Amino acid sequence: MSTPIVLRGMTWDHPRGYEPLQACTAVWKAQHGVDIVWDRRSLQDFESFPVEDLARSYDLIVIDHPHVGQVTREACLLPFTGALESIAQGSVGASFPSYHWRGQQWALPIDAATQVQAWRPDRLNQAAPDWDTVRALAREGRVALPMRAPHSLMCLYTLAAQLGAPGRVEGPELFDADIGAQAITLLRDLMQDVDPVCYTQDPIAVFEHMAQPDARIDCVPLIYGYVNYAWQDFRPVRLAFADMPDLDGRGPVGSALGGTGIAVSAFSAHVDAAVAFACWVADADAQRGPFARAGGQPGHAAAWEDDAVNAAAGAFYRATRATLDGAWIRPRHDGYMPFQHAASERLVAGLQSGESAATLIADINRLFRASLPT
């Protein structure tokens, strides 16, 4: 009698990150006899921890797309081959191609996210339709914006794209100097009316505060969507989500894409079993079924368009789909991840010190040039 296969997986430490994978694992084990033990890492570690180190300890790893250039150099992940058409065609927005790099597919999207708008439906009649409305709410002390690294840079990316000049991922200059400076000025003007604690907060911290009855925050114009907070009774106050506010008449285009994909370690002793689970959990049946029911934020359109999935989440998916479909893929070259952290910290320091927008965008562009492969 053969020994049952037990895989090890690593995901991120939030109910959205681990509960759907645990639920899907239970279904998979019942069907195929393969178990998976999931460990977790903090959100900050998730964005910065070396993937190669994880690949030497785990069979399955949840990653985000800016890592793909680094993992290609490290040769620590196994590229997916074979029939992936169902997953590719069902991908929401650019989620599937965001993990395609140098001719190979390094992960399969299981979670789709981008910067959208969060709001309090118990106190606002509708989400803020445009940036002028956001500014008016901010002057009343009713707006927050997560600015802890890397989210400060994500806001800059999104605003620059909304102004008509998305980041140039191939370089050499990441931001158009004039548009980048305009985006920094927009950020600075907003942050003057926002509690400075936001410089220390990531999206989860903002949501946890916003979902309390006595919180003053009614609108967060740019924040990575978390479907859990749109559920009834997840927190004391149920939040609503919408497309990001319009800026300059261009609609909800250019939001900095987030989300996660599932990858297979090149060092796994059970490659076939790991690949089989990854392909199943990223496809339609699992995504709109056990993955969504357990609190996941699926990456497959079958879930985003499903009536039952939307009903449970206050129409989260339909309300933010246009922003997700118009989202922008961040740079992914080897060397990008250190840049992302350094540029985020540099941006916050410049905003807090009152440094000129032109000087600040020039320095961020300098950091980006230095990160590019030679």
Regions found by a protein language model. Give the residues of each.
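Extracytoplasmic "Venus flytrap"/periplasmic binding protein-like
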Residues: G33-S91, D218
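Hinge/lid segment of periplasmic solute-binding proteins
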Residues: P66-V116, Q126, F241-A242
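Long, aromatic- and glycine/proline-rich binding clefts that accommodate carbohydrate-like moieties
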Residues: A292-A342
